């Protein structure tokens, strides 16, 4: 085994579902795994409950980054992670997804020297106004291992000029967690607690700044949701960043606000829904794996495979278009289908790549050229 100590970084809810199976697979193969939690999401309902639901052990180190502007948050994580990385001296660091913690820890790792692996590499929305897109692109650029969830993500990386030895199509690690916990989720009593009947309600999630921070955009979305609720009652677990804004604007009849759900309850709510309306990338993937129709309230998606090979439909943010799209989906739901390699084994593939791929001294690094390539005019 070339790599023995690996730091795995988690910072926000989407990271938790992705890092757990990777940690488990690495430890099954004998790696010394250190879990670092940056504290980017620090609300108890969005943090501790996911560790409990997923059975993640308490973090070995906690950075306590908290909230703030993008620069403040990224800077705090970098400042806290740098001395920790020097202390731990790992062979590799694994970052997941596209949040500020991902980029912060990637930059620190790249300058410190350990190998860097990016889980979910190659996802592209082609929307440079999204902070997550900037984080994705910058993290990929400094990573040694680009662990792509699907062939289209790998194609993006190849088109951007990455070496073939960096790019690995491993499948969707988030689906590893979903499949491992689906039986437990289906045993949840959350539908009974909310008086819901399977297949007789819609589920809504809203959290992206473009949707919830702009009062006009949020009013437009609520107008569309209010019209849809007349046909299909809607349940909206309230993300902390959206709670105050929803309260200030007011929610139409037929939309029921409930507290943010834990992981198992939320999977159960998705699994039982007639349709899911979301601006979340992860929910697009989970609904595809569950075979549940999904309408994405965005103009683009970094996960187009869920549209081409899944149950996802892009509706944009125009209220009339949203209403028309949801009505069409309710009348004629997309057939359940799931992309290749979303089979619950992505984390095992990731472990093999990391543990068999060499060390920082033996591998080519991110800016090394492929054999035969030139850096400029002869």
Residue ranges of each PLM-predicted region?
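A donor-sugar binding/catalytic signature common to diverse glycosyltransferases
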Residues: 95-96, 107, 118, 146, ...
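C-terminal amphipathic helix plus adjacent low-complexity
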Residues: 331-378
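Short alpha-helical donor nucleotide-sugar binding micro-motif in glycosyltransferases
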Residues: 81, 85, 268-273
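Active-site and donor-binding regions of nucleotide-sugar-utilizing enzymes
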Residues: 5-27, 50, 62-163
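A nucleotide-sugar donor-handling region in carbohydrate enzymes
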Residues: 41-45, 64, 142-216, 315
């Amino acid at each position: 085994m070339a790599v023995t100590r690996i730091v795995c970084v988690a910072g926000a809810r989407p990271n938790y579902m992705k890092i757990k199976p990777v940690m488990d697979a690495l430890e099954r193969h004998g790696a010394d795994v250190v879990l670092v939690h940056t504290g980017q999401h620090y609300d108890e309902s969005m943090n501790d409950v996911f560790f409990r639901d997923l059975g993640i052990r308490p973090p070995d180190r906690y950075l306590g980054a908290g909230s703030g502007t993008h620069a403040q948050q990224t800077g705090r994580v970098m400042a806290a992670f740098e001395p920790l990385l020097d202390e731990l001296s790992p062979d590799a660091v694994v970052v997941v997804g596209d949040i500020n913690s991902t980029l912060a820890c990637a930059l620190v790792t790249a300058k410190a020297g350990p190998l860097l692996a990016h889980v979910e590499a190659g996802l592209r929305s082609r929307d440079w106004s999204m902070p997550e897109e900037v984080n994705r692109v910058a993290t990929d650029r400094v990573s040694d291992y680009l662990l792509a969830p699907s062939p289209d993500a790998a194609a993006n990386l190849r088109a951007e000029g990455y070496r073939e030895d960096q790019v690995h199509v491993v499948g969707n690690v988030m689906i590893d967690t979903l499949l491992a916990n689906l039986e437990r989720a289906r045993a949840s009593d959350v539908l009974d607690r909310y008086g819901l009947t399977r297949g007789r309600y819609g589920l809504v999630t809203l959290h992206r700044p473009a949707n919830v921070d702009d009062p006009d955009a949020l009013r437009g979305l609520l107008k569309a949701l209010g019209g849809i609720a007349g046909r299909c009652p809607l349940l909206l677990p309230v993300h902390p960043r959206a709670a105050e804004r929803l309260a200030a604007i007011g929610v139409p009849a037929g939309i029921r606000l409930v507290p943010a759900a834990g992981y198992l309850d939320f999977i159960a709510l998705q699994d039982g829904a007639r349709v899911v309306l979301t601006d979340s990338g992860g929910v697009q993937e989970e609904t595809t794996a569950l075979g549940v129709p999904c309408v994405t309230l965005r103009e683009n998606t970094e996960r187009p495979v869920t549209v081409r090979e899944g149950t996802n439909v892009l509706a944009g943010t125009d209220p009339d278009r949203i209403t028309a799209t949801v009505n069409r989906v309710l009348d004629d739901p997309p057939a359940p289908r799931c992309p290749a390699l979303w089979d619950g084994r992505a984390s095992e593939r990731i472990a093999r790549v990391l543990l068999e791929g060499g060390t920082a001294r033996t591998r080519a690094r991110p800016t090394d050229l492929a054999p035969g390539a030139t850096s400029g005019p002869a």
